Regions:
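N-terminal chloroplast transit peptides
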Residues: 1-5
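Active-site neighborhoods and metal-handling regions in enzymes and metal-associated proteins
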Residues: 9, 13, 25-650
């Protein structure tokens, strides 16, 4: 959301129009045009000049303009046509908020992107390091650091109603000015004809054997919530929620199988607002009973609906992530803010989805075993050392992943990072400026795949030479935190906020830490990041407790600027724990079941820091990896022999 920054810059190049899942393998590609964005800052002088001319014009007459990362659906990941903040600033990380005044340009981002933002932005921009003492939030910056009478412009489709109202109140309370909703997006005007076109790719049906529940059943469960809230209906704007609700998938946003649409569910009607050119005959048949309307008509129809809501003294439910523009169309008196029921329904995976997650991670593990077996051989036995680049090997990993059954592409752009690049937490290598693999340095690889039966996300850190004692200690402390979180048993409903310190304590003992959350939910052939659950120090997740059926990643790390990065990530299922007693009185206890099946490098472990309990955990985990993954590998192959060695007992 606008000021609640997300995790990672992910690009999924799905430029084709697959009519069915069978076409996805050949159409999904990450072979995108490569630039030197990480090496050379973008010159934004002319862009900012044009933007400020628009701001100063009589038509708009504003003193500041807010450019968020999100699109009209408050998506974490956006299509190329919606990368407005990246265009105006040059910084293309997934998390950030740009504020442009008549004489300043400020970029607010968090610790995951400090290095990347500094590299990608020119001298026109000031980096505002979120989380550092003394650095204001974007709201406080606007309210406290601008002169009295300031008019702050926003695109109302790109800011949530909650955030817009909070900012407006702050501005007015301090007497500094007002919030101005501008229908035209000023960055789009500056961008002009060079702005990419909005995708119009066809959508396809997500088979019931993978979804595990019909869309009619899902709608019925949503209606139960609507009736419980004594409301007339629910407005759905989050793209992954719409895809989940209708058992449809799309290719409008890179790496994310979603499509541009809105939906309104009432007690007696379901309306899907979508470009009808996206619908095949099969999808139209699938949507029997659903009213289909053009995408942009939702604003007019909500405005018309507002009159009947006034007459009946009823309300439509909207979530806190609903845009200011949608709430304006309905009228604030006609809406009731509520947590979207779909967020929680989607987070609790059914039996088919859980089995799909287990199976796709086994196949993903086979791809990674083949990859690391190949990579080690290239570096140590061939001439790959100081020849293969970060992009070269990332491309090889994608090739091997796509060979797996049901794989249709990547779930995010592979973070393939050597040495100092590993310290850029969400580094995105670009051909031409990417580093060469070096067996004297750490190699961090964070990657994932999209499969018809699930989504994967895994990080491993390896050293193909001789690690230093300090590298081994840091790695071991990260692993100790990973194991501590994995072994946790906790009451049903416990928040990840309470569990997060388990992963950090081994680092805290030395006064070390990492500037990112420890875990996030993972979709089922959907977005690689989903809520409401998470493991983090952020208080926003306190109310999002764990329930059986959820997914979560476990990914502590440690990063030294200019030196190396370490992260160990497994995707896990939240399952019931069999405890001797039940102090909860019936709600029971939970634990994590790791489904990622990839070895953790023993060579990087300092045995003197490792306890017997931790050693047993690692050996048990590796035994499970070998049992599940080895049957999928060719005996005697590089991947098979690598997996056999790496999963041998410590």
């Amino acid at each position: 959301r606008l000021f609640n920054f997300a995790r990672r810059n992910l690009d999924w190049n799905l430029s084709q129009r697959p009519a069915s899942p069978s076409q996805l393998k050949q159409n999904y590609s990450s072979s995108i045009p490569i630039s030197n964005e990480m090496a050379t800052p973008v010159n934004t002088t002319d862009r900012l000049k044009h933007l400020r001319e628009l701001m100063a014009s009589a038509k708009y007459n504003i003193n500041a303009y807010v450019v968020p990362s999100e699109d009209a659906h408050q998506s974490e990941y956006v299509a190329a046509c919606d990368e407005r903040r990246a265009f105006i600033s040059g910084f293309n990380g997934s998390a950030g908020c740009a504020i442009v005044t008549m004489d300043k340009a400020a970029m607010f981002t968090d610790g995951r992107y400090f290095l990347q933002a500094r590299q990608q932005m020119d001298d026109n921009w000031t980096l505002m390091k979120r989380g550092i003492p003394g650095v204001p939030s974007p709201q406080d910056y606007l309210a406290e650091h601008l002169p009295e009478g300031t008019r702050v412009g926003i695109d109302p489709t790109l800011m949530t109603a909650t955030e817009a109202n909070e900012l407006k109140e702050k501005l007015q309370a301090r007497g500094n000015g007002d919030l101005v909703a501008i229908e035209d997006n000023l960055v789009d005007i500056v961008w002009g004809k060079d702005r990419p076109e909005r995708p119009k790719n066809t959508v396809f049906i997500h088979d019931i054997k993978y979804a595990g529940e019909s869309h009619d059943s899902k709608v019925a469960r949503v209606r139960e919530f609507i009736e419980k809230e004594n409301a007339s209906g629910l407005v759905v704007s989050a793209l992954d929620e719409i895809a989940w609700l209708f058992n449809l998938r799309g290719t409008d946003i890179d790496f994310n199988p979603v499509f541009f649409a809105y939906a309104v569910v009432t007690r007696d009607k379901v309306t899907l607002y979508i470009d009808e050119a996206k619908l095949t005959d099969a999808v139209r048949s699938h949507l029997s009973g659903v009213v289909v309307r053009p995408y942009h008509e939702i604003f007019g129809e909500l405005n018309t609906l507002s009159s009947s809501l006034v007459e009946t003294k009823s309300h439509l439910l909207v979530s806190s992530s609903t845009s200011f523009a949608l709430v304006q169309a309905l009228g604030t008196d006609n809406v009731k803010m509520s947590k979207s029921p779909i967020t929680h329904l989607k987070a609790i995976k059914n039996a088919a989805e859980l089995e799909g997650m287990r199976q796709c991670h086994i196949r993903d593990g086979a791809a990674l075993a083949n990859y690391f077996g190949w990579l080690e051989n290239e570096l140590l036995n061939k001439d790959g050392n100081l020849r293969l680049s970060e992009v070269d090997v990332a491309d090889k990993l994608e090739e091997l992943r796509r060979e797996q059954e049901h794989c249709v592409g990547l779930s995010f752009s592979t973070i393939s990072s050597v040495g100092a690049n590993g310290a850029i937490i969400h580094y995105s290598p670009q051909r031409g400026s990417d580093a060469l693999l070096d067996i004297t340095k750490m190699y961090l690889c964070d990657s994932g795949g999209q499969y018809l039966d699930g989504t994967t996300d895994v990080t491993r850190t390896y050293h193909f030479g001789e690690p230093t004692a300090w590298e081994r200690e840091c790695f071991t402390r990260v692993l100790k935190g990973h194991i501590a979180l994995d072994r946790a048993v906790f009451p049903n409903g416990t928040s990840g906020f309470a569990l997060d310190p388990l992963a950090r304590m081994p680092l805290w003992e030395l006064g070390l830490d990492y500037r990112h959350g420890t875990g996030h939910g993972v979709g089922s052939f959907l977005n690689v990041h989903e809520g409401p659950q998470g493991v983090s120090m952020r208080k926003t997740i306190i109310d999002a407790g764990f329930n059986a059926g959820m997914t979560i990643t476990n990914e502590p790390g440690y990063y030294e600027d200019g030196n190396f990065g370490i992260r160990i990530e497994n995707t896990c299922l939240v399952v019931k724990a069999d405890t001797k007693f039940d102090y909860t009185g019936g709600s029971g206890y939970l634990k994590f079941e790791p489904v990622t099946m990839v070895p953790i490098q023993k060579k990087l472990i300092s045995s003197e820091l490792f306890t017997d309990v931790e050693r047993k955990w690692l050996n048990d985990y590796h035994q499970e990896v070998w049992r599940k993954v080895s049957p999928r590998l060719e005996k005697g192959s590089l991947g098979y022999e690598w997996l056999k060695r790496e999963t041998s007992p410590m």
